[in-house]
């Protein structure tokens, strides 16, 4: 699937992928990169191989702003199987215990209520978190349990969509760093029977939704111009910052890394999406630091050369 590096193009933008089941996020990214023959690509948050759903892929200069999506809230739809605990917290693991499921919808709703808001989570052993330079899952596969510190995360939304007496489908909106596998397992323990995930689908990240994404198989059927037409501009990653336009005489200085005069009242350390006034083109991010100047902090290289 690889193409010679010399033939890859400098192309900028964001492509929303619907990651399929049983491939890694990196494999999905590399496939998208290959389909667009892009020189540079990066994603904005890893999905487990068994998880599906929204995976924003940043190409070219858009990779400079990918961290803003890493920090964004995420939405998921998950299926939780109660009464069965596995080593990994999902269907890939070996069964370690089975207990009867002896609760109804009312008790389940009450348990879910306890997990809304700020909660404490212990990261799972089967995760990419590192300990002494190695991911935790390598220790787990070797049968080694590594102590992990609990971390605070926020569950902004936790809604029960369906329950058949054994499995429940839940809709979750959470802050970064939340492990949905751990959430499902913890809900099961709170109900006295344990649980694991049988399905997980990311439905949202930042301001993007799964409805806007594209399947890799569909992209393969398109020609290159049609694929390029699906790219979103880099500034979609930073739309949560206020917009600011600079006059042409200031934009040159700004694009060469020099701070420019800024007299607008705002909070100290406020960041702005910066555009050239005449062309309306996005050039990068600037930061007001309370010194009467706007400092460039992240610029599009292709705009600096324009």
From Swiss-Prot:
Function description: Responsible for synthesis of pseudouridine from uracil-55 in the psi GC loop of transfer RNAs.
InterPro entries: PsdUridine_synth_cat_dom_sf, PsdUridine_synth_N, PUA-like_sf, PUA_sf, tRNA_psdUridine_synth_TruB, tRNA_sdUridine_synth_fam1_C, TruB_C
Record keyword tRNA processing present: yes
A Pfam family it matches: TruB-C_2
Active-site annotation: 48 (nucleophile)
Xref: NCBIfam families: TruB
Listed name of the protein: tRNA pseudouridine synthase B
UniProtKB keywords: Isomerase, tRNA processing
Gene3D superfamilies associated with the record: Pseudouridine synthase (3.30.2350.10), PUA domain (2.30.130.10)
GO MF annotations, alphabetized: RNA binding; tRNA pseudouridine(55) synthase activity
EC code(s) of this entry: 5.4.99.25
Taxonomic superkingdom: Bacteria
Coiled coil: none
């Amino acid at each position: 699937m690889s193409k010679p590096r010399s033939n890859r193009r400098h192309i900028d933008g964001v492509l929303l992928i619907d990651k399929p089941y049983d491939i890694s996020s990196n494999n999905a990214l590399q496939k998208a990169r290959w389909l667009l023959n892009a020189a540079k690509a990066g994603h904005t948050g890893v999905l487990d191989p068994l998880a599906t759903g929204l995976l924003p892929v940043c190409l070219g200069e858009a990779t400079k702003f990918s961290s803003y999506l890493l920090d964004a809230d995420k939405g998921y739809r998950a299926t939780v199987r109660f009464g069965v605990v596995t080593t990994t917290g999902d269907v890939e693991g070996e069964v370690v215990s089975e207990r009867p499921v002896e609760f109804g919808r009312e008790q389940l709703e009450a348990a879910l209520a306890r997990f809304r808001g700020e909660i404490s989570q212990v990261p799972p052993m089967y995760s990419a978190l590192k300990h002494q330079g190695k991911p935790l899952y390598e220790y787990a596969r070797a049968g080694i349990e590594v102590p992990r510190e609990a971390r605070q995360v926020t569950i902004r939304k936790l809604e029960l969509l369906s329950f058949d007496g054994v499995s429940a489908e839940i809709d979750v909106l959470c802050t970064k760093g939340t492990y949905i596998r751990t959430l499902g397992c913890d809900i099961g323990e709170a109900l006295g029977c344990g649980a694991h995930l049988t399905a997980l689908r990311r439905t949202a990240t930042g301001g993007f939704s799964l409805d806007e994404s594209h399947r890799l198989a569909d992209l393969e059927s398109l020609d290159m111009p049609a694929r390029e037409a699906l790219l979103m501009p880099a500034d979609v990653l930073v739309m949560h910052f206020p917009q600011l336009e600079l006059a042409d005489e200031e934009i040159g200085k700004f694009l060469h890394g020099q701070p420019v005069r800024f007299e607008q009242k705002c909070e100290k350390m406020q960041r702005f999406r910066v555009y050239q006034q005449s062309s309306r083109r996005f050039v990068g991010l600037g930061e007001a630091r309370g010194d009467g100047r706007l400092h460039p902090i992240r610029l599009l290289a292709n705009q600096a050369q324009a």
